[in-house]
A protein has these predicted regions:
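Helix-to-loop junction immediately C-terminal to a conserved catalytic motif
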Residues: 48
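Conserved ABC ATPase "signature" region
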Residues: 108-127
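Conserved ABC ATPase signature
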Residues: 131-136, 140
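A short, proline-enriched helix->beta-strand linker immediately N-terminal to the Walker B motif
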Residues: 151-155
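ABC ATPase "signature
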Residues: 217-218, 226, 298
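The conserved cystathionine-beta-synthase
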Residues: 261-285, 289-294, 300-316
Length: 316
């Protein structure tokens, strides 16, 4: 879907992105994370040419992005900003309709699309269609920002720390909403964040960056199980470890139900440690869990990631 081949970006003599080689799969939720100045936002902005590459090539569906008409490229890539950036003197419907109007959709098609998108994020079109941005809460504005990016049905959506300016409750709700929304729309989403809990909650894969380079690219489970080096261990591992050290499988039990496991897989007790479960899950997709000899469910890496993300959020 999106492929970087030896992509670099320089400002004066400083390389802010250094020879990136990566591929983002169609329909995946791909998270870029790292400390401030690591190049994650620059990497994302090179996809829609808001920032031009210095070296290397980016391909979308096998085509060099330099071969696209730049306006059409950007119209076909949704973009959600941290600052939301709704036009204050336009109604909510008018804000959402900007790109469809640029693409010369007819008015009835636009009206139906606006109403469909508002319903998709829980905003009643009859109530919100003709409101002005200053009549909405921060969370409602960001919902509009998200659906505006989806208005022309792009294949790709870029999200630049879209929830970081929101209060904790709004942020948590929007994270849940975007997970549900992605299950429906199956877009290719590139999401920038500095928040590990957010990355664990949202990402199919997480790309950890440092000084313009990829340090580790893996699933949330893979990064938790096998941090690539001391930097990842410090940036992610040390943040996660306090939430599983000393914990037992029983702590995760509310998340576990049903599931299929290999017939010959030996069960773990609910009183076994999460560390023991993690070791098993390095080589097994699911581990059967038993209580007093009775099967209670199959534990997967995703159960543990969900538990750890919730613990990190709850305790900061």
């Amino acid at each position: 879907m999106i492929r970087f081949e030896r992509v670099s970006k320089m400002y004066n003599e400083t390389k802010v992105v250094d020879s990136l080689h990566l591929e983002i799969k169609k329909g995946e939720f791909f998270v870029l994370i790292g400390p401030s100045g690591c190049g994650k936002t620059t990497t994302m902005k090179m996809i829609n040419r808001l920032i031009e590459t210095t070296e290397g090539t980016i391909f979308i569906d096998g085509k060099n992005i330099q071969d696209y008409n730049i306006d059409e490229l950007r119209w076909d890539i949704g973009y959600v900003l941290q600052q939301i950036a709704l036009f204050p003197h336009m109604t909510i419907a008018e804000n959402i309709a900007i790109v469809p109007e640029m693409k010369k959709w007819d008015k009835e098609k636009i009206r139906k699309r606006v109403d469909e998108l508002l319903n998709m994020v829980g905003l009643n079109p009859d109530v919100y269609r003709n409101r002005m941005p200053d009549e909405l809460s921060g969370g409602q504005k960001q919902r509009v920002g998200v659906v505006r990016a989806l208005a022309a049905n792009p294949k790709i959506v870029l999200m630049d720390e879209p929830f970081s300016a929101l209060d904790p409750l709004s942020r948590e709700q929007l994270q849940k909403d975007i997970v549900k929304l992605q299950k429906k729309i199956q877009k290719t989403i590139v999401f920038v964040t500095h928040d590990m809990q957010e990355a664990l909650t949202l990402g199919d894969r997480i790309c950890v960056m440092r000084k313009g380079e990829i340090v580790q690219l893996d699933t949330p489970e893979g990064i938790i199980h096998n941090p690539a080096n001391d930097f990842v261990e410090e940036f992610i591992g040390n943040r996660v470890r306090p939430w599983y050290e000393g914990k037992i499988i029983e702590n995760v039990l509310p998340l576990v139900s049903g599931g299929q496991v290999e017939n010959d897989a030996s069960p773990l007790s609910i009183y076994a440690s999460l560390q023991e479960a993690l070791i098993r899950l390095e080589v097994e997709e699911a581990v059967p869990i038993e209580r007093d000899g009775q099967y209670v469910g199959a534990l997967t890496s995703r159960h543990i990631v969900t538990y750890l993300a919730a613990q990190m959020k709850e305790r900061g």
